[in-house]
Amino acid sequence: MSKRKKNKTNYSKSIFRIASLVILTCLVYLIFGGNIGPIKFQGYLPQIKKHFSKGKNAVTSKQQSGSGLYLYDGTAIPEYSKEQIITLNNDKPFFTVDEINSLVNSHYFTYGGQDMYGRATSAIATVSKDDLVASETRKGIELPNPKGWVGRSKGGIYDRSHLIAYTLGGKNDLDNLVTGTISFNQKYMTQVEGDVRDYIKSSGHSVLYRVTPYYRGDELVPIGVLMEASDGSSFIRNRFVYNVQDGFTIDYKTGEVKEN
């Protein structure tokens, strides 16, 4: 091959590579709208994207079903206004079809683990009658301190609060504990926990149960928790419990409290 032909061939290949690179760059720009970076799903789950929208204080948390990371910021949840527990989505939980179907052929307790700040992120379980535990059996068990815990001496308003209650088979470690007020834990979370426990006892059916804490940004104490339950049929719950205590102001970033 002559030197001229060889140079012409190399020149054609170079033009082809440049053209390909330009086309690829244009495609990427069109797909991502010029905002190339980490891709995060918007919403508590992709199937219910419409329920949650992006906010300034969004936090990435591990979604417990193994489907990756989801961005949720609770903007569909109204600001706390006297009602410490509210019903969402007409009490219909946000479970996927696959999650509901897991009631039929599997039994599990799955925890989302702790995020980069050491906070518990989520817990989901198929709770059966065999998982129910009498509360008396927990006496003497020492619980670790979750993030934001400042002890009972500073205001005396906190409990080490289980995501999945001990009486429903939940474990006693930091994957399943958050700092919650006594009112939040003992008065309002127990309402949903009691409903689940009573239904399982009376019906003998298993219940799909999920509790997800909501944090603002890097705050250590959750603003509240989303509690969902379903037997796959008539028994359903979808409640949000606010982590507040009458007469006190909470610094959710540190856990410090001040009496009003």
What is the role of each PLM region?
Residues 1-14:
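N-terminal Lys/Arg-rich, disordered targeting/topogenic segments
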